Design a protein with these regions (language model features):
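PP2C/PPM-type serine/threonine phosphatase catalytic domain
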Residues: 2-248
Length: 248
């Protein structure tokens, strides 16, 4: 899930965020198909991202905030269950038989912190919370925060191979029939921000309604709160991506 750009685009394509998300996903899957272990795939994909970024960018970033970064939730099944590796605020919701949903990742805490930050900035500058990340009043704070990425524990997927040593990981017990809902923070907002579901209800709805219906529900909530006054956020809508899996 590529982080929204905060300045000039440096890479070819639709956006730097879109380039990194697509590039990273392709490289991770390619290395897994070649037999790499999950940690090896992450390390190699980061190396490739750094190499490609340095070769194709229009110019070097003037500061860290110009560098493309993304969140990631990467899961791989093996004989012991499922291994999850992640950066940032993507999440994996794990539903086992007769057990509550387990949320893997740091997304809930990060979303809550962001909502508080948005509300505080909006009040300070007299803006609607969802005025947009390109507002000068927001850009300064967002760029300052982005400059801390890949320092002091704030690591993300990006063109920096050093991040491989800081990827979060968890071994997930996943017996046959276990359901996993992988999602970006924009999709998880149904539970983390908009209180339309809790974790269990969101996984159940994904199975009963399908992901497309949930995305439509998500956009309807956002459409009814365009200024972000009920649900503070930097943008009216964020990218929402989800994948529903079942262990066989």
């Amino acid at each position: 899930d590529g982080a929204t750009g905060l300045g000039d685009q440096l890479m070819p394509g639709k956006s730097d965020a879109a380039w990194l998300a697509a590039f990273g996903a392709r490289r991770l899957m390619a290395y897994m198909r070649d037999g790499a272990l999950p940690q090896e795939a992450v390390s190699a994909a980061l190396f490739d991202a750094q190499t490609s970024f340095e070769a194709l960018r229009k110019r070097p970033p003037a500061d860290t905030w110009e560098t493309p970064f993304s969140s990631m939730m990467f899961v791989a099944e093996d004989a012991q269950g499922v291994e999850a590796l992640w950066f940032g605020d993507c999440a994996a919701l794990v539903k086992r038989a007769d057990a509550p949903v387990e949320i893997v990742g740091d997304a809930l805490e990060r979303r809550q912190n962001e909502a508080r930050r948005v509300a505080k900035l909006a009040e300070k500058h007299g803006l609607s919370p969802a005025a947009g990340v390109n507002r000068p009043e927001y850009l300064e704070a967002l760029r300052k925060a982005r400059n801390f990425v890949n320092t002091n524990g704030h690591w993300a997927f990006g063109p920096d191979v050093r991040a491989a040593d800081h990827v979060s990981s968890k071994r997930i017990e996943a017996a046959k029939g276990t359901v996993l809902l992988l999602c970006s923070d924009g999709f998880l907002a149904l539970a983390s921000d908009y209180n339309a579901y809790d974790g269990d209800a969101l996984v159940a709805a994904a199975q009963a309604k399908g992901l497309k219906a949930l995305c439509e529900e998500l956009r309807a909530i956002e459409k009814n709160d365009l200024e972000g006054k009920k649900f503070p956020r930097f943008k009216t809508s964020d990218d929402a991506t989800a994948l529903l899996l079942r262990v066989r």
